[in-house]
């Protein structure tokens, strides 16, 4: 068997681990109806992991493609969550927390882009 045939399994297992980490972080951070700190934190953590992983891969090309796929697509994909971002956005909108909504979207999208840009330019 070719090792490429095992890539989906590695992605699947790593995504389960990423989802578990996301869940554990959400139980660790105090829940607040005013602001979804847990979602923001795991998305920032996912950005950090993905940028670190990609930069590391580009610097050290000896890393296995399967490992990169498992960690990038699997773990980081399971850790970060666009659907929770949207759900939290709708919850803030429905409850009339407009200032929190604007801040959340600015921090999530703008902050995420700035974090990715900063980490991408940083010399490790």
UniProtKB/Swiss-Prot annotation:
HAMAP family: FluC. Belongs to the fluoride channel Fluc/FEX (TC 1.A.43) family. This is Fluoride-specific ion channel FluC 2. It comes from Streptococcus pneumoniae serotype 4 (strain ATCC BAA-334 / TIGR4). The keyword Nucleotide-binding does not apply. Na(+) is not transported, but it plays an essential structural role and its presence is essential for fluoride channel function. GO terms for cellular component: plasma membrane. Keywords: Cell membrane, Ion channel, Ion transport, Membrane, Metal-binding, Sodium, Transmembrane, Transmembrane helix, Transport. It is found in: Cell membrane.
